[in-house]
């Protein structure tokens, strides 16, 4: 008896699609991944997809630093993948496998970089980026135009020519990025027509590190709760995390005199940068664990901190935050002063905030730096 053996022919499909793995769904890592997908297509004409598990095609991983490094073997992270990681946890009691040192890890703040250095892992700092289009759109919407030529300020937004400089002035090659310069003649003070005194967007889990309860207590002490809008998971807040459209969020940010950011610790912290991108100043704890994108801003309001205590996360055991030690009456007074100053900001002040962000934290600036670490191409 003769057998006719048929050998299957493999169907090999080659694709230029760039695969990004996000650490979770409907979270900050997912949001960063979706923005990367949008702007790598806009500025480089590269199509990418966002996945939520590791695959052989993964080129970029956007996730929590401790989670990825501690599970580097179980996750089967491809050797060619670029890890763009950060974390709000200052310490973990789990061991990081030694082969994690085989990866170059990009992170978003100096204190996160210090963690990696102590672990013996090569690292570089590449900050997160905001939504360029919405930042320009809603900043331009709040600008007041005036024909008084003696007081007109002529500014170019997002072209990198601003004199305002920040801590992370990433200077990667952006020659292949299409410029989108918006010129606006502006004058006057736009603070009088703001809808809210204070806005806060506090995303994330219910582990308390965003200090939602503290902010509510401060607003009550200053009788500001009725003139504030809060996004958080608590029932006392006005909207749930990730429930707003991008237009609703940026409209909200642009209609506030002050953005409150009282988080204990952040790998980076996108919401306060989004607020500054539309000219809204930020009040925050004076802490190395939160002030990476804030400390060099032309206008910001630090609240006094008298040290830190290590606080274990109630939701993820073995992970710890750096909780600031403060005097409540003191920070209430400083918060009140911050709002008073924010109320008197001029358009020129708000332009400075907007340009600081566009120069340092726009995708037009950040993507060339990522490209460099991804082998020079996406």
Curated annotation (Swiss-Prot):
Enzyme Commission number(s) from the entry: 2.4.-.-
Gene3D superfamilies, sorted: Glycogen Phosphorylase B
Enzyme class: transferase
A Pfam family matched in the record: Glycos_transf_1
Keywords: Glycosyltransferase, Transferase
Keyword Transferase: yes
Keyword match Glycosyltransferase: yes
Molecular function via GO: glycosyltransferase activity
Family under the similarity heading: Belongs to the glycosyltransferase group 1 family. Glycosyltransferase 4 subfamily.
Protein name: Putative glycosyltransferase ORF378
């Amino acid at each position: 008896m003769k057998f006719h053996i048929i050998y299957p022919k493999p169907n090999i499909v080659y694709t230029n699609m760039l695969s990004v793995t996000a650490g979770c769904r409907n979270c900050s890592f997912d949001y960063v991944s979706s923005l990367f997908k949008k702007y790598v297509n806009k500025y480089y004409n590269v199509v990418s997809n966002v996945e939520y598990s590791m695959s052989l095609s993964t080129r970029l991983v956007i996730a929590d630093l401790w989670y990825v490094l501690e599970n580097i073997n179980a996750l089967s992270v491809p050797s060619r993948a670029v890890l763009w990681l950060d974390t709000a946890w200052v310490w973990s009691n789990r061991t990081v496998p030694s082969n994690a040192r085989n990866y170059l890890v990009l992170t978003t703040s100096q204190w996160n970089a210090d963690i990696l250095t102590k672990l013996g892992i090569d690292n570089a700092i590449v900050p997160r980026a905001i939504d360029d289009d919405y930042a320009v759109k809603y900043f331009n919407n709040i600008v007041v135009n005036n024909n008084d030529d003696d007081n007109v300020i002529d500014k170019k937004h997002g072209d990198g020519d601003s004199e305002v400089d920040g801590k992370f002035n990433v200077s990667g090659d952006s020659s292949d990025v299409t410029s989108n310069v918006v010129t606006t003649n502006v004058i006057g003070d736009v603070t009088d027509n703001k809808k809210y005194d204070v806005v806060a967007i506090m995303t994330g889990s219910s582990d308390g590190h965003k200090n939602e309860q503290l902010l509510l207590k401060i607003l009550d002490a200053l009788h500001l709760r009725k003139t504030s809008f809060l996004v958080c998971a608590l029932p006392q807040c006005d909207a749930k995390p990730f429930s707003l459209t991008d237009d609703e969020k940026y409209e909200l940010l642009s209609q506030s005199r002050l953005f409150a950011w009282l988080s204990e610790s952040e790998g980076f912290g996108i919401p306060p940068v989004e607020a500054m991108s539309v000219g809204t100043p930020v009040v925050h704890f004076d802490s190395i664990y939160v002030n990476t994108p804030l400390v060099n801003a032309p206008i910001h309001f630090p609240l006094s901190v008298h040290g830190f205590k290590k606080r274990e996360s109630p939701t993820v055991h073995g992970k710890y935050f750096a909780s600031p030690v403060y005097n409540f009456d003191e920070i209430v007074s400083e918060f009140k002063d911050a709002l008073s100053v924010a109320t008197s900001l001029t358009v020129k002040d708000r332009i400075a905030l907007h340009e600081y962000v566009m120069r340092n934290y726009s995708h037009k600036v950040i993507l060339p730096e990522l490209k460099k670490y991804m082998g020079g191409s996406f």
